[in-house]
Amino acid sequence: MTKTFTDLLGLENNVYTANKVKANVVPKQSTNAFINAQNNKTYTENGALTNESTLSGIVDWFFHGAALRHENNEKRIIGLFLAAFNEDPTKALRTLFYIRDIRGGQGERRVFRVCLKYLADNQKDWVINNLNLIAEYGRYDDYLVLLETACKEETIDFLGKQLEKDLQHHFNNELTSISLLAKWMPSENASSPITKKYAKILLTSGKFGAAKAYRKALSLLRKDIDIVETKLCNKEYSNIDYSKLPSYAALKYREAFKRNDLERYNQYLEDVKAGKKEIKANTLYPYDLIRPYSTQLDGWRNPHVNIDPTVEAQWEALPDYVPEINGLVVNDTSGSMCGLPMDISISLAVYIAERNKSEVWKNYVIPFSSHAEWKEVKGKTLAEKVASVYTGDCSNTNLQAVFDLILERAKSANVPQEDMPKFLLIISDMEFDCCDYSYTTNLERIKQKYKEAGYNLPTLVFWNVNSRNNQTPATINDQGVILLSGASPAVMKIALEGGKNMLEVINSIINGDRYARIQY
């Protein structure tokens, strides 16, 4: 008979005591194209005519979902999800898990957890039957939001059984079979009130034994899975194998390593630079590595900020997700992008530009705000590269300036069609300025300009990094336009090679093997 973890630890089982949302409205399509166009019009924050929806709940969800990190209104998040769910439940759920997916998707926690809580209270059976999938795409602390939902008891049972399994592996010396559950389980003596609350819910359930048993279980398992936090707390610096640290831990605790183990840590970084050892960066976003510079005084434009060797090493170690494309990166540096969205925009621009396989467009970007400029990524350090493309123009969002710049140069030099960029990746919050023709959308005006100049329109990739309103630059009827969202470049190759219309691209991402287990 399988023993409980309290029995395994030899401790007494003394128990520790102490409304639905409407779907986002996707305008119904009439048989009349003019009526469809009129019903779907709205305006950006800067007064530009645009589309309220792509005319597909799935595409709207995909385009906004991974860019909602700063959205305070949970009803908007759930509304977008429900519009997609009403259109195709399986695709909506797969997109939700793609948004959360730490390794192959966008790694967004909050949006996933908001929707997971809603599902727990409104699609309880589905959540219960798929509890095991949550940790596969996210982390074990994602389960904690379910402790205040209709799935509370089932979640507690699931976590308790996993903890028992891990302890069985511990006592059988099967350490490689132990999950990361113990790393993310809440401690009742934590500093965070929310963490304390979750720990109390677990301990008062009667499924985790006494507080003493619970603490001992977590302590044993955390030692087995070799989490660096335990070694830091115990001041066991010489026992830390830096080459085995997870990506985020290597970045987060770098200053502690310098303070307490400087000589050995510096030698490790030298070995990384020489190719003798590796440093992990596979779960980091490019913006994670720009923030240590951008948060310094005048960090974006100052190439002489304090250079961080850990950041530099991890930037070089980032996986290369950029496919072979004949294209240019265009990044929004307007005032509304200040803060994290600006970091995401600049970091993705530098990341894509320097990994661009095109001999012509490699290391070139076009930042835009009130005007657009050609910029070349230059420098040896990441700080120098960021400074080389930062313009300091943080005013309005004149997207048309980008295309005016490209077409004016092309016409003046009689550039043939085959030498024009085939892709343009536009990284922005999508709050574009009004066109010179106020009755046309930015996309319509861009199409007009290319036609007037005698060039074919390139494939336009609108990459949403900060969704504040339900508006989109294109609809599903616009061919040659791809809509993405989020801060991770992990999906670039699939997205840019997955098709020529939005639904084809989304299907190529969420209908692959990685998300095949997610069914409704």
Question: Language-model segments: which ranges?
Answer:
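Long lumenal/extracellular ectodomains of secretory and single-pass membrane proteins
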Residues: T2-I344, E354-Y520
